[in-house]
Amino acid sequence: MTGKVYLVGAGPGDPEYLTLQAQQCLQSAEVLIYDALIDPRILDLVPANCDRIAVGKRGGAESTPQATINQLLVEHCQQGRKVIRLKSGDPFVFGRAASELDALERSGCDYAVLPGLSTALAAPLLAGIPITDPVLSRGFAVYTVHEPDALNWEALAQLETLILLMGSRHLLTIGHELIRHGRSPDSPVALIQWAGHPQQTVLESSLSRMAQQWGDQPLSPCVIVIGEVVRLRKYWAHYRYDG
């Protein structure tokens, strides 16, 4: 019997943001290996007899080592089972998919990758922030701030719109480095917490004040948007698709 592993993007939160392909795949899963940020309602889509394995993967919190996750995928696949590796957002956007695919490839396991709606792009929309605009922003860049010392802050400071992930513990560094390299201290900033979940919250501040305003709050998981497009939120912040 031949097994197969599916790396599936769960989107930003609500099960309604799953693709049809992802929903169909989950409904026939035999093993579900999922990250910490997956909405519990998505877990209800798998069969009752599906083995569910939580592997964490949340910044700063306890999680299963990547090598162990790779081993789980290979072992269950070699047992002839349909394995779903469920990741928040899109598997290929800061999803560490390369390590898992490499392990499957080296072990001769069959696999497929199903795209998901990236939280980096969905979060601003759900907060009422267009990340491009004919006047205010002709483009954007998405970066992770997991290792702030590795970033080229001089280059980032010149970009019209910045979308930052894993930055909740580095607000002081983000503000300091961007201002030091020429960004206006008054640049508007929005922080979208738990994007796409029922408890979604949006905070607004400026580059020079955000660390002081938000520093004492538990902010993870969040997406940070920096740029003049944040000012457009006042026109569309009320908009949420409700079916």
Swiss-Prot record:
One of its GO terms (biological process) is methylation. S-adenosyl-L-homocysteine binds at P12, S88, G89, D90, S118, T119, M166, A195. It holds the Pfam family TP_methylase. Pathway: Cofactor biosynthesis; adenosylcobalamin biosynthesis; precorrin-2 from uroporphyrinogen III: step 1/1; Porphyrin-containing compound metabolism; siroheme biosynthesis; precorrin-2 from uroporphyrinogen III: step 1/1. GO terms for molecular function: uroporphyrin-III C-methyltransferase activity. Keywords: Cobalamin biosynthesis, Methyltransferase, Porphyrin biosynthesis, S-adenosyl-L-methionine, Transferase. InterPro entries: 4pyrrol_Mease (IPR000878), 4pyrrol_Methylase_sf (IPR035996), 4pyrrole_Mease_sub1 (IPR014777), 4pyrrole_Mease_sub2 (IPR014776), CobA/CysG_C (IPR006366), Siro_Cobalamin_biosynth (IPR050161), Uropor_MeTrfase_CS (IPR003043). Its EC number is 2.1.1.107. It catalyses: uroporphyrinogen III + 2 S-adenosyl-L-methionine = precorrin-2 + 2 S-adenosyl-L-homocysteine + H(+). PROSITE patterns: SUMT_1, SUMT_2. It is a step in the biosynthesis of both cobalamin (vitamin B12) and siroheme. Belongs to the precorrin methyltransferase family. This is Uroporphyrinogen-III C-methyltransferase.
